[in-house]
């Protein structure tokens, strides 16, 4: 990564750094337009700056920061786009109305239970982060939730293969989790990325 020392003149302006990260993203992802690359660059920088304890040095390693997997803002945005896409697919299958649906345990896998439990921890993570003045607690929470959600996404049957009640249950869980996920993105001031 790049070492920055103000005594040696190695300081970047934030906008220049975002542009450099955005250029790396555009080079890495063929379908990335400039606006999307800028949003991903901001996300990459936010996560890179907040994933570790603030008392430690921050390493600016652009190739690592822009990876599609791992502890990166790009990975988190990829997860958010996947969740919204799955939500849209489930809605297209005719399960958009779940106002009278209650969560049924027979449709919950152990991984889904773990995800729901993790999602329920957001208020505690915020409280702890504020009390200790450690923003990395929230970032690590979001990275962990992203990993669990991607595992769930990869292991889940396709929406078209689900029975109606199973689809409704998945939509209800997904809707709840997406609310938590997007609130956490906003908490970290990450811009919304619509497609990847």
Segments (PLM) and residue ranges:
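Non-catalytic interaction-recognition regions
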Residues: 2-196
């Amino acid at each position: 990564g790049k070492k920055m020392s103000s005594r040696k003149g190695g300081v970047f302006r934030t906008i220049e750094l975002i542009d450099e990260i955005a250029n790396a993203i555009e080079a890495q992802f063929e379908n990335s337009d400039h606006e999307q690359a800028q949003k991903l660059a901001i996300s990459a920088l936010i996560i890179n700056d907040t994933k570790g304890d603030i008392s430690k040095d921050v390493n600016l390693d652009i190739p690592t920061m822009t990876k599609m997997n791992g502890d990166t803002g790009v990975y988190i945005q990829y997860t958010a786009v996947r969740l919204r896409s799955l939500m849209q697919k489930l809605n297209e299958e005719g399960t958009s109305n779940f106002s009278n649906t209650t969560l049924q345990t027979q449709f919950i896998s152990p991984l889904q239970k773990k995800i729901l439990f993790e999602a329920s921890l957001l208020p505690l993570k915020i409280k702890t982060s504020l009390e200790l003045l450690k923003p990395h607690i929230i970032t690590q929470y979001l990275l962990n939730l992203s990993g669990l959600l991607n595992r769930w996404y990869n292991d889940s049957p396709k929406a078209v293969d689900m029975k109606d009640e199973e689809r409704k249950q998945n939509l209800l869980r997904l809707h709840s989790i997406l609310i938590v996920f997007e609130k956490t993105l906003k908490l970290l001031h990450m811009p919304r990325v619509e497609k990847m």
